Amino acid sequence: MRPFNGQPLNARLAKTPMTRPIAPMLTRRGALAATAAALVWRPAFAADAAGVDQAEALHVLNRLAFGPAPGDLDRVTQMGARAWIAEQLHPERLALPAWLAGQLDALRTPNETQRELVRQYREMAEEAKLAKQAETASADSKKPATAEGGDRRRQIAAIYAEAGDERLLQALGSPRQLQEVLVDFWFNHFNVYQGKGLDRVLVESYEREAIRPHVLGRFRAMLGATAKHPAMLFYLDNWLSVAPGTQARRGAAKASGLNENYAREVMELHTLGVDGGYTQQDVTELARILTGWTMQQERPRRRRVADGMDNAASGRGDSIFGFDPTRHDNGPKTWLGHAVAPGGQMEGEFALDALARHPATARHLASKLARRFVADTPPPALVDRLARRFQDTDGDLRAVMQALVDSPEFRDPQPVKFKTPYQFVLSAVRASGIVTSNVKPLMAQLTQLGQPLYGCQTPDGWHDTEADWLNPNAITQRVNFATALASGKLPLQRVDDPNAPAGEANGMKAMERQADRAMTRDQPVEGSTAPVDVGALLATLGPAISVKTRAAVADTPPALRAALVLGSPDFMRR
């Protein structure tokens, strides 16, 4: 859907061999660029000497994981692809490695409740407002009104960054690879944008509470969890939606009447699909049904102290979702042909039940799953079977995934898929055998590659086809990343700089500048990893790298060989 950095998409490159350089490469990497340009953009699934079992193992690791890490190919070949898939479908049975569990335990945000996160953000916003007022009132006052303001901004920046830490650490190192792939898929399906206000601090909670527990559970449970999470309520503004006249009665300055954003997107994107048979009137009626679905309000600390209520028992529940009957439209409604009698919050629960069980929802989700795991153009017969399985099991996502991986369409290695930037970066780090304690450079790389983590501003999420991601500039950026990673120039084991800018926007810019320096320096920066061993890399990837590419690698200067593997057309497909 989105071109890379505004460049026009060039889907034709996906269909034709490349006989000239794909794009101007960095001149000091001329040897790598010349060799990469000579390779042909076509499927390179090589099952000759490696054998059918190894090829099948590679296939499932590329489709159901973020590619093989060292030892994965041998392990899956020995145990069999079917046994590995059965293991992946029950991630709760797989223990996390101690190093990963330790890094996750060190994160602060997962221990914070929604209420605490929202309170911190609002107190930061209040401090910023007071500082701005002070600057306006006094020309020589150029600093925040209190030292607390700077501390608060640092806390918010840490929460913002920890969402990415938690996601990437698990995607790279967890043995529960299918779960991680599905977390990415379903977060993208129920997308929220981390850059919007309150969602700066809520995205981690949203993924941990509303997405991750449900990726192999019931779709209805995930639909309800996302609908009620404050990250979604805030992102699509349903927390402000009120029945006509309610704002005047309650004097709610921020409530501007009926808001249709969530009602529209939950049908168009989350359930029925754009061709799901609903009308604009259905959107309006569903918006009326969902009035009153909001967040419990928490006043900033300064106001609580002023009112003598700082220690008031406001509760420490995990959720701040609340139904406000004074905002709800209690009139009769007709939606999707259903007469909906007044029933408060249960009207919304009825609507979500109906959407989760609708045949159009089954088909829409089946099509998206087939596109993600099988082909850019989903096979119609597979979509039919997955939709039927979804309906027969009342939206059991584990059963649907089992049907998908058992299908002949999934087992067929053709056609191949072109990796998104997210898949490319993760698979490159995993294949290189790098155990990272600092994923922030990878977050910066994802931004440079056009797919910032949690950075899709529109509710439809990132698209997942070759036409969306294959263009000359994008390939140039990928080769540059492959070169920096392979040569050990990325500081993936660097301890965070305590003097980094406090704001998350400044922090991301600093990471991007650091990534730029890493890409152009001849020498690794502090905290960089060792150069990638090309022999170990080729052993890890096995039949993924074609005979032709291996020959090109052998003719390349040793210092560039691992970069050529990671920047090859073979590696950019899965």
Model-derived regions: residue spans:
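Intrinsically disordered, low-complexity segments enriched in serine/proline and basic residues
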Residues: 3-9
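N-terminal secretory signal peptides and thylakoid transit peptides that target proteins
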Residues: 17-36
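Sec/Tat signal peptide C-region and signal peptidase I cleavage site
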Residues: 42-48
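Active-site substrate-binding loop specific to GH73 endo-beta-N-acetylglucosaminidase modules
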Residues: 200-214, 218-434
